[in-house]
From Swiss-Prot:
It comes from the Archaea. Pfam families: PadR (PF03551). InterPro entries: Tscrpt_reg_PadR_N, WH-like_DNA-bd_sf, WH_DNA-bd_sf. The lineage of its organism: Archaea, Methanobacteriati, Methanobacteriota, Methanomada group, Methanococci. It comes from Methanocaldococcus jannaschii (strain ATCC 43067 / DSM 2661 / JAL-1 / JCM 10045 / NBRC 100440). This is Uncharacterized protein MJ0944. To M.jannaschii MJ0361.
Length: 120
């Protein structure tokens, strides 16, 4: 589930890193993300499985080829959810928020009205 993975530790940092730097190999990501290699590997594999990042292995004759990761278009859209979260957290308690998300593929505008449920 997308929301579940986005709330996991270091996922936001990984997505933002790949968005900023482009394609990186595992050790480059590990250098920036302060976690155990096994935890990072597990998280990256989950992100690949959900289609938020893509994975490719370097095509060469090395015994251990480098694995590269890159943010996908879906991953870029997922980063928008962190922005929505920030807007909601920064809003006043009694304020209604209208969020417009533009779908770049077919330019549909999706309006979502988020009402503060505490006032109801």
């Amino acid at each position: 589930m997308l929301i579940g993975i986005l709330s996991k530790k270091y996922v936001k940092e990984i997505l933002e890193l790949l968005n900023e730097k482009g394609e990186l190999h595992f050790s480059q990501i590990h250098k920036e993300i302060p976690t155990h290699m096994s935890s990072l590997n597990r998280t990256l594999n989950e992100l690949v499985k959900l289609g938020l990042i893509s994975k490719r292995k370097e095509d060469n004759k090395q015994a251990l080829p480098k694995t590269y990761y890159k943010l996908t278009p879906l991953g870029k859209k997922a980063l928008l959810l962190y922005e929505v979260e920030k807007i909601i957290e920064n809003s006043k308690n009694n304020q209604n928020i209208i969020i417009q998300i533009i779908n770049g593929k077919n330019h549909n505008i999706i309006n979502a009205k988020i009402v503060n449920i505490h006032n109801k």
